[in-house]
Regions:
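Catalytic loop of short-chain dehydrogenase/reductase
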Residues: 90-91, 99-101, 107-111, 120-164, ...
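Conserved Rossmann-fold cofactor-binding substructure of NAD(P)-dependent oxidoreductases
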Residues: 59-73
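N-terminal Rossmann NAD(P)H-binding glycine-rich loop of SDR-like oxidoreductase domains
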Residues: 12, 20
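Rossmann-fold scaffold of SDR-type NAD(P)-dependent oxidoreductases
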Residues: 9, 74-83, 129, 169-170
Length: 184
């Protein structure tokens, strides 16, 4: 068993949950976050004694620092929290767009900022930010998502520069075939 702790924001479903399972399988400790406290804690309990669940809604960035205050040293951070969106220019929903920009750009940034003094400053520490393929291949209704995911690229580049030697990478998957979004 390892003393390494990996935080997976958005770790209660989808890719985030699968990554959390992989972290545990490798012998590390994982902290998963999700918006719903009861659900997050239940999923952490299912993952076992090397998992902890914390309620965290990164679309409310002013609460992030306080919600993560109890964490010790962090050896890896995965930012995989998302919300689905179908915002077109003809039916543009400003409030929905603001929420998504806040969640993915401001929320991701504030999460890194809140954990900065606890991120092990070594090349063995990594941060992974999830964007999405829509940054390069937009689809009908992806106006906001495509724009935000382009912003994730800029964020990855800036964080890599500012946080070296910590590794910072971005992943931009397309629609995952076994996800609920695929069924829609």
């Amino acid at each position: 068993m390892s003393d390494r702790t990996i935080v997976v924001v958005g770790g209660t479903s989808g890719i985030g949950l699968e990554l959390a399972k992989d972290v545990i399988a490798k012998g590390d400790r994982v902290v998963i976050t999700g918006r719903d406290e009861a659900r997050t804690k239940a999923i952490a309990a299912e993952l076992g004694d090397r998992a902890e669940g914390i309620a965290l809604d990164i679309s409310e960035p002013h609460s992030i620092k306080g919600q993560l205050a109890g964490l010790g040293q962090v050896h890896g951070l995965v930012l995989a929290a998302i919300e689905r969106d179908a915002n077109t220019i003809r039916d543009y929903d400003i409030d929905r767009a603001i929420r998504l920009v806040t969640l993915k750009l401001v929320g991701y940034t504030e999460t890194v900022h809140a954990l900065l003094d606890r991120l092990d400053p070594s090349v063995d520490t990594g941060i992974v930010l999830f964007g999405g393929r829509a940054k390069d291949r937009p689809y009908p209704g992806s106006l906001t998502v495509s724009s935000i995911n382009g912003g994730v690229v800029g964020m990855v580049n800036a964080l890599a520069l500012e946080l070296a030697p910590i590794r910072v990478n971005g992943l931009h998957p397309g629609i995952i075939g076994d996800s609920p979004f695929w069924e829609d």
